Amino acid sequence: MEKYFPKYVPFFSLLALSGLLYLLWSITSLESWNCQTVSTFYQLQNSIQSVLKTSELLLPTEFNYSFCAHLGQEPTLEEAREESYLLKSIAWPEPSTLGLPLRQSSDPAQSYYTIQDTGDLRVGGQLAVKVHMHNFLGQPKKHGGDFLVARLHTPELVAGVAGQVRDHNNGNYTIFFPLLWAGVAQVELTMIHSSEAVMVLKRLREEQSDRVFFKSLFRSGYISESTLCNPCLPLKPQPLCNYTDPQTGEPWYCYKPKMLDCDTRIDHSKGGYKKNLLTVYESQFFQSGVNIKVPIHSAGVDNVTVLPASKVRTKKMRLEFTPSGYYYQGSWRPLSGVVPRQFNTSSLINQCLRGKMLYMYGDSTVRQWYEYLITNVPEFKEFNFHSAKNVGPYMGVNMNYNALLKYRCHGPPIRFTSVSSAEMRYISNELDGLSGGSDTVVVISIWSHFSTYPVPVYIRRLRHIRKAVIRLLNREPTTLVFIRTGNLQKLDAESSLFNSDWFSQQLDTVLRAMFKGLNVQLVDAWEMTLAHHHPHQLHPQLDIVSNMVNFILSHICPVRKKKKRG
């Protein structure tokens, strides 16, 4: 009988697939899925999997079976088109030949850059730098895809600006810097990951989205159990608890406890990080000091002298890249939108925040701003909600100036130690509860905890937040809304697999595109950390945070234009 079984595999597969399609047809919407439905779905997909495993010929590659593809509300045609456009915009160049040995991968120690023109460089112009990537054999690379970042800086002036890297897909790159101050400026170039390492990161993002796992504690009386949770759970013949948000359709599932009901969940927490994610071959591309965040040096001079702008009126040069701002004398100077102000005393901050309500939503990088204001403005008194440390929610009230500060973390996934399930809120739902107005300031930061997931998961979350922001601005157009971008951080061989700057850069590109054209202010944390001399950290150092807060306060309390005398 066994020797005839393979020829019936297509029949059994078709039969199982028909049952699956019937089940999907009978489910009218995601919100109506209950625990029993989801569990049945799991068991049915498991049946399909077991049938397919009878013939290796039917499985040409190793698949990551999970529930991810079937979660979330169906996007509209317009949303699907936008998602397709966004994914194309972050498509990364791939090596023409995969599986090359380490010695043929990018070696920052043997790569170099050259400054194109050291002649008459003046403020208002630009600097072009050519980068030539070589492998460990000293041979020129023939393809692109290396992840490089660069800055131009003058230590004596505490000045710095980010550069734009252009990949020519042949092993060569061009970096453009705007020239924004006079003096001797030095080029600093870093290879964060080789193109070969990026291919590994792409695989992990698509195939191992549950490499950070979460858990929830369930309790009733003296009985307690913990189970794994995620929006993407590995297929198991085990019942699920469905915690999909009814307003947004954002999916979240936990395996059902063996002895308790789903409504006995009391918290959410980070479970941990998966180990042994890489093959021996892949691990070669993640070596600290060798090919992770290693500087690339110049083949000649590494600095230029920038002269003051010419007093003679000349045709304005077309710049290849215009950054959002730059540092000068340690202060961030935006290039558009607002005149920067320095709020160096609690008195200045108090005057600016008089009568204001600041609502901060998101991850720990925006919680930093809440903590900065609470620490530097003693008039703010915190309410004790007995919240877990570094989790929140937090609230500070300034009775003297009638001001309010609030911080709340975003909904799952979030890698905090322990969050009460009653406090798990989605940003879009919170925004819908705000009245808004000229006294309301909203600050949002959501990026770091999505680095391990396929990009469509992040797009879906931002889509809900964007809709809520639009609704808020329609209710009260005078509401100020700030969106914080992601930033660079410290990396090693292990953290690169979960928190790589490449993941953050991909999400950052998506975030900027999705909020472009809306009446929101972007706090460019990416450029503010790249242009600064401090080492990269997930939580930037105090003077960077100070510049970020000053940027926000400069928008809340802009410099008043002097009226012209008639």
From Swiss-Prot:
Gene Ontology CC: extracellular region
Organism: Danio rerio
GO process annotations (BP): nervous system development
Entries under InterPro entries matching the protein: Ig_E-set, NXPE4_C, NXPH/NXPE
Locations listed in the record: Secreted
Keywords: Glycoprotein, Secreted, Signal
Residues bearing glycans: N64, N172, N242, N303, N344
Pfam families found in the cross-reference section: Neurexophilin, NXPE4_C
Name of the protein in its database record: NXPE family member 3
Signal sequence range: 1-32
Protein family per UniProt: Belongs to the NXPE family.
